Regions:
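Periplasmic/extracellular loop-to-transmembrane helix junction in inner-membrane transport proteins
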Residues: 26-67
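Transmembrane alpha-helices
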Residues: 122-126, 158-191, 219, 224
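Transmembrane-helix boundary motif in ABC transporter permease subunits
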Residues: 64-94
């Protein structure tokens, strides 16, 4: 079954490349370069060091902002899920921040704090934080009260209860927030870099847009998507298997 799934996945990729090549040959235009042309630009970017440098800068911003948002979001989400009065007090604010456009937050952070790295990170964190809080809060509300009562009867401290009772139940929600967070946060980072940074993938994509360099836009996009896929395959899926091994 696994080999069949891999075969189907490979087949879908080959069909996509064939369709892409066909459209590129039919249009014969710079607006849709062929896969070969994009691969050549990708290789040149790697050899020159430009692509790895800007990709690394963006990934560093992603790691820092994502880590801050997840740590704060998990902590606040657990607190709100366990305390109804605090949840009622902050609920409207969560709804407001969930619906504030990312572009508005980014612009305000740059206006208030200047075109500095900390403002860029803050803008990304503010945009991601409400999503994490809401996801973890909903997960906390579904915690099995019987298990919590049992932990209390056995004299579990707060730390032991969190690690052995609360966290295993919250794991699916944390992984959901992580995956949706990666999908959201790198898009926000690109806008942040486009508006106020002098390096990174967003900055480069803005330059390529001004030059109508579609091949470079696609090459840089493919590079970033490939890295996100590697994070999923090498980090998130192994973590999932390890955390859920007790079910097997």
């Amino acid at each position: 079954l696994i080999s069949l799934n891999k075969l189907l996945s490979t087949l879908s990729l080959l069909i996509f490349l064939a369709v892409w090549q066909g459209f590129a040959a039919y249009l014969s235009s710079n607006t849709l370069p062929s896969p070969e042309a994009v691969a050549e630009v990708f290789w040149q970017g790697c050899v020159s060091g430009q692509l790895p440098f800007h990709l690394g800068v963006t990934l560093l911003r992603l790691v820092v902002s994502f880590t801050i948002a997840m740590l704060l979001g998990c902590a606040i989400g657990i607190v709100l899920g366990r305390h109804k009065k605090l949840d009622a007090f902050f609920d409207n604010w969560l709804v407001i921040f969930l619906n504030v456009p990312a572009l508005v937050t980014i612009i305000l952070c740059y206006v208030w704090f200047g075109l500095v790295e900390s403002a860029a990170i803050l803008a990304v964190v503010i945009n991601k934080l409400p999503n994490v809080i809401v996801t973890i809060r909903e997960g906390t509300r579904t915690l099995d009260q019987d298990l919590l009562d049992m932990a209390r009867c056995y004299g579990f401290g707060k730390r032991k209860t969190l690690v052995h009772v609360i966290w295993p139940q919250l794991h699916p929600f944390v992984m959901g927030a992580t995956r949706s967070g990666l999908a959201l946060i790198w898009k926000i980072i690109l806008v942040v870099e486009l508006l106020g940074r002098s390096n990174g993938m967003g900055y480069q994509l803005h330059l390529f847009f001004q030059l109508f360099d579609v091949a470079s836009i696609l090459a840089y996009t493919i590079a970033f998507v490939a890295v996100i896929q590697l994070i999923e395959l090498l980090i998130l899926k192994p973590l999932d298997k390890k955390a859920l091994r007790w079910r097997r």
